[in-house]
Amino acid sequence: MSEGSRLPPPPRLEPRPSQAPLAPVVETLEVLGFVLGSEDYALPLTAVREILKVPPITEVPRAGEDVLGILSLRGTVVTLVDLRRRIGLPCGPFDRKTRVLVVQRDDEPIGLLVDAVTEVVRLRRDEIEDRPAVPGTRHAEYLAGVARPGGALFVLLNLPALLQDL
């Protein structure tokens, strides 16, 4: 190109209004569903680091009644809590469906023993209700709310309350 010939400036682009209205943003929460006894429970999926088959457990003398013992996870000691006992349900036997949900409390991994893991569910915030006020409910502080997606019923657990005082 010679000095005298320059390219014209590019055309100026003007923003166009959107043709379609934006859909409303629906806030959702993904939860991991699991079974304790005959009831469905859930924790936020982001709180669960791993799901394990039940490994060998080492009993710890004088541990709390909720604590089954400890286990080793790739060289890290994990305290194992019987979630049934923790929320006041009767103990049940282990079987091939029994799983350990590994969650985190500060810098310490905690294993929560559950009867079975069922599914990951995406809940809309409007499907989540506050915990019901049921007189005489033991361990009500462990309940965060309930959700009824598609006719199912999940009891949402309050993980910080569950892990407190272990």
What do these predicted ranges mean?
Residues 1-166:
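An acidic, low-aromatic, low-complexity terminal/linker signal
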